[in-house]
């Protein structure tokens, strides 16, 4: 009955975000090579049901807000075997110039790739 440690869900949110970037054709490595980073400024996680070490889980991600400087994602972790919602969450991140640490506007070449995926809350 080993319950999944609560911190793992935040790591899974990150993995889902990285995969989302990749799926829309934006590589975080390319962003970094262009001098940008995407730090997360705020994280929320509401735990609804426990998950266990042998559970197969699915992380569902939605991009719910997008400006050229900020992105907000909502998450839902579910156990597909019984359709149990394990947790929900939210992250807010901002585009930052890695050289200065200052908030910066995302170049249009990246921004236009994300816009079609913004969903209303």
Predicted regions and their residues:
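Hot-dog-fold acyl-thioester-processing enzymes
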Residues: 1-40, 98-121
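Histidine (H) residue identity feature
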Residues: 5-6, 42, 49, 83
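Hydrophobic beta-strand-centered segment that forms part of the acyl-chain substrate-binding groove
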Residues: 20-71
């Amino acid at each position: 009955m080993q319950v999944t440690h609560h911190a793992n869900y935040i790591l899974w949110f990150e993995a889902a975000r990285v995969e989302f970037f990749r799926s829309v054709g934006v590589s975080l490595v390319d962003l970094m090579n262009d001098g940008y980073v995407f730090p997360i400024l705020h994280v929320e996680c509401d735990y609804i049901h426990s998950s266990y070490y042998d559970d197969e889980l699915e992380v569902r991600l939605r991009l719910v807000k997008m400006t050229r400087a900020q992105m907000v994602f909502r998450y839902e972790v579910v156990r597909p075997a019984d359709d149990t919602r394990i947790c929900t969450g939210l992250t807010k991140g901002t585009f930052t110039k890695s050289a200065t640490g200052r908030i910066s506007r995302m170049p249009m070449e990246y921004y236009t790739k994300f816009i079609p995926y913004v969903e209303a809350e």
